[in-house]
Amino acid sequence: RHFSKITEKMTGLLEKVKRDVIGGQSAELTVSGSAGMGISQTCRLPFIQEVYATSIAAKRLVPGTDVIIELGGEDAKILFLSGGMEVRMNGSCAGGTGAFIDQMATLLNVPLDEMDALASKYEKIYTIASRCGVFAKSDIQPLLNQGARKTDISASIFAAVANQTIAGLAQGRPIKGKVLYLGGPLTFLSQLRLSFDKALKIKGILPENSLYFVALGAAFCGTEQINIDDAIDNIKKYGVTGKFLSIPPLFENKQQYEEFKNRHESCRVKRGDISSYKGDAFLGVDAGSTTVKAVLTGKNGELLSSVYKGNSGNPVPIIKDYLLSIYNSYPDVKIACSAVTGYGEELLKNAFGIDCGIVETVAHFTAAKFFRPNVDFVIDIGGQDMKCFKIRSGAIDNIFLNEACSSGCGSFLQTFANTLGYKIEDFAKLGLFAKHPVDLGSRCTVFMNSQVKQAQKDGATVEDISAGLSVSVVKNAIYKVIRAPSADALGKNIVVQGGTFLNDAVLRVFENELGVEVTRPDISGLMGAYGAALYAMGKSSGKSSVIGKSELENFKHEVKVTNCGLCSNHCRLTINIFGGKRRFIGGNRCEKPVTKRSGQNELDMYDYKLNLLRSYKPVPGARGKLGIPMGLNMYELLPFWHAFFTSLGFEVVVSPLSSRELYTEGQATIPSDTVCFPAKLMHGHVQALVNEGIKNIFYPCMSYNFDEKLGDNHYNCPVVAYYPEVISANMRCLDGCNFIHDYVGIHRKHDFPRKMTAILGKSFSGITYAEVKKAAKAAYGAYDAYLADIRSKGGEMIREAEKRGMQIIVLSGRPYHLDPEINHGINRLITSLGAAVISEDAVSCRVRRFHTEVLDQWTYHSRLYAAAKYIGDKPDMNLVQLVSFGCGVDAITTDEVRRILEENNKIYTQIKIDEITNLGAVKIRLRSLFAALEK
């Protein structure tokens, strides 16, 4: 590994080769690899592109190779050699590469070889996103916090890498024949190779010298004798051009830094001497994504003791040791009340009998208020999450969380520090006095890797890079997460907190960017725990339920894993047992396994609609079976098509409910990883129908939807409208089927029978216009009845919720967000928090067309705007918008829905959903919303 010190490593290797191998002054030298082109051009050395080098080595060393799968440090490649060479490479994302696996091993706190050994002993595979380290952390960290075994997580990471490579790179082309595995990860990790074998249903080949195929191919292509000494001299001079984009230094001189430091050191928490303290104390714990923080405060909020540690995937032993140290060393201190916040809240609450749980945003606000009573904006940047909230009239008014990317968070900086061989504490200080901070923009870790490397090649120092990364963190927070139009939009009394703001460079950039002086408490990294302790102080009854010394000394923590069968989510549950008495169930997406409630009394339109659609059963017909893939717009139009084809004498067979297994069945035919998850699922649904032996499958292209008179037009989005074309072009399994995907316009009611008669006439004999006209009448009637049912039931649930005094959440998205595999049970999470769930189509009909600030031309999106408008004057109703990651149109809808809500002083809450199944961050967002509403 070169750790970005390319020239040093390369010259060292060449000197070793010269000394130990060739003995002479010259050799046929050819350069290859992603960093090789610049070196070859500057140093006038022969270059061969690495893909060609790999293919040449494969043809020479393993004749008859059909496919090569190669995973490197930051790149992944699939080379199809049979039938003409075709190359598939990762573009913008390094998910599923060596760097990704390294990040995951760091997260698990195990060496790579141990991770491989752990994976061989797995029992369960969890769903983990492998697109980038950030997404995977979103899945893995909560699993660790819930007590899942590292054996299962390790195997799940390898399975995710295999699935990511196949779905993201093969792009629909089958991987078969003689398949070679190359590159470091596939060479060193036997369980990763096994994951590929299982996913592809093959036995891949790991050839001898699999690490060196690019170098071997380059050697086989050598034609020119190069003087090694000259090459070494040229490489040593390579790269220092000084030509990189830079920005002004953070501090002009050390005096300016000292003034800055003194100003911020004035905001200090009062401290007490725990060794002499007697009486009631209050415990606050913040179980974050990567760290655990705990504080003990006195009766006046003075800080008596604290701990701040990386949780290494399990916060339980850290809190156990902390409590024991207090009991053993300070017997006069009595814990009168305790509170816990963060990802590991429920785990620690159940493990140690902690009195209260508090949502993170409220904990941080409570602490911020203690230091600056008139605070109007709080920003907290942690390891992989960012929380910002505006305060109005002493209550949280608006919340911003990073949805899908942690490029503005602490783990982003830590990853770079580790990559460059520094501890994060040392790396952070390097940038303070950088002469020319590199301008890196505000992009994600993967994009920035290449920019950092290029800047290094151009002569940027590590100091310049450290400062540049601090700038990018702040810009990402302000312009990507908060999306502030100006500095004034944030507020005048800003409190910053979280471990990342302990970095003086980040703090300086933040103040410079906003042009304001902010408050950073000296316990910036402990604010969540401190806020929890203050909250506990306010809730104290004098006696805490935290377990005592004797029970703590005999404390044991055991973990079991099982599948839940109480609802269609089939969650993989992690059962934590503490000392045989208490237990905590993690991994559940609803409350059924915890409370054993049936859910029959819950007011949930999502469940109601899903059950309604599942009630459409096949009716045997003379014309045989016809399959409909149950996804995308079929979640809206199933009643229409079911009535239509049943009337024509077809037995309508609908594909099964989505599941991870169904997705995996179709993933090899997905041609692009950028399409939204609901569209990706369609491949699995079509495959399921084919596997069932259905020979006629109906999935039409539909440019237009029904016109509900709410917008300027009534299109379907391009993915919904034309995805049948993608299915037809990429799924070879349809070769033996009659796949009907003609263009249909159900909005043209009078024209529809004639069009459908022509379409069906191409595939079936004997279908008359009269039959189709009759079927069309049945279809439109069934659809109207379905809509009437939804609207009526929605009204009924709203009235019942009002009668019970419940909060009502209009969970707004697309019809296909009903799919439990897509929404991950968010509707049930909301009902478990005591609110009713209404869908947007149940209320959008109650609004007449109104002016919007955007072109309103999509039927489903018009409903979103109408739902936002409808709840504007309803005090007990609020809206939560579901957004599928990768949805281009929602870049527009989210801003417009936010605008409509904020015009009516409503809080806008957005939840981005895709393959990631863990709802830790979602729960924080929803609980924050409810906490704000209570105020």
Cite the ranges covered by each PLM segment.
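Glycine-rich phosphate-binding loops at beta-strand->alpha-helix junctions
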Residues: 34-35, 169-199, 210-214, 341-344, ...
